[in-house]
Amino acid sequence: MGRDTIAEIITSIRNADMDRKRVVRIASTNITENIVQILLREGFIENVRKHQENNKYFLVLTLRHRRNKKRPYRNILNLKRISRPGLRIYSNYQRIPRILGGMGIVILSTSRGIMTDREARLEGIGGEILCYIW
């Protein structure tokens, strides 16, 4: 039985954010590196470092948190896995959903690599919907 690395990184980031951890470490693969670069570019995380330990590579992510102590803590990241190994979800570029009216992003796996919903609409290609982030 294979591992779902996308679900693992989504769960790790979500759990670290709920526990108010500043740093989270995830396994480094080509897919996880592409997803993390999208998160960094869109401003959902602050920093990424590649770390090697015992000939295995890890990505060390620095999460973005609110520093306002007056209001109750609110999670910055809401991540939801959509397509999974048992049920793949595909969409053409016209039917890619908009999250919160364009405030969130959809991460897609396309024939031209992993990209956001905005990039896929501009290029006019669809693909497998990996996750929603808002």
Swiss-Prot record:
Biological process, per Gene Ontology: translation
GO molecular-function terms, A-Z: rRNA binding; structural constituent of ribosome
PROSITE patterns on file: RIBOSOMAL_S8
Main location: plastid
Localization per Swiss-Prot or TrEMBL: Plastid, Chloroplast
Gene Ontology cellular component terms for the protein in this record: chloroplast; ribonucleoprotein complex; ribosome
Classification via InterPro entries: Ribosomal_uS8, Ribosomal_uS8_CS, Ribosomal_uS8_sf
Entry function: One of the primary rRNA binding proteins, it binds directly to 16S rRNA central domain where it helps coordinate assembly of the platform of the 30S subunit.
Assembly and oligomerization: Part of the 30S ribosomal subunit.
Cited NCBIfam families: PRK00136.1
UniProt name for this protein: Small ribosomal subunit protein uS8c
Name of the gene this protein is made from: rps8
